[in-house]
Amino acid sequence: MFIDSVIWIAYKNKNDSWHDKAKRLLPTILQRTRERAYVTDYVALETVNHLLRKTSFETAKETLEMFTRSPRITTLYNNEDSFRATYDVFLEHPHLSLTDANIIFHMARLRERTLFSFDKGFDAVKGIMRREDAPAQ
């Protein structure tokens, strides 16, 4: 399963409109499932930079450490080939950001269908099952 930036940002930012929902969702999906949680380095970058602007250095640092140290989270790193493939996905989906296109690329590469996100723009992407709710126990 992939987890989009908007979930991490809402979870860590008390002033975010999705904060309460993310506070219920994220711990549940990380504790109840045995699935690996994936983020990309683009998601980490987008999340940490947003938190640095909207919250504090400490919050941004804690989040970066969570991405790099948690045994439940795998961060996928990009190279020149993945950047070029992401660019192609970006051109196919003009309603999504470059980070979103990168998530789509990595999901296709890993044949992963589940994405936790509050971003309804992903609903238009064939093959992705966007979720806002926790999996059943």
Where are these regions (language model features)?
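Acidic, PIN/NYN-like endoribonuclease modules and their adjacent C-terminal/linker elements
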Residues: I104-F105, R109-Q137
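Short, well-structured N-terminal submotif of metal-dependent ribonuclease cores
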Residues: M1-A37, R53-E62, D133-A134
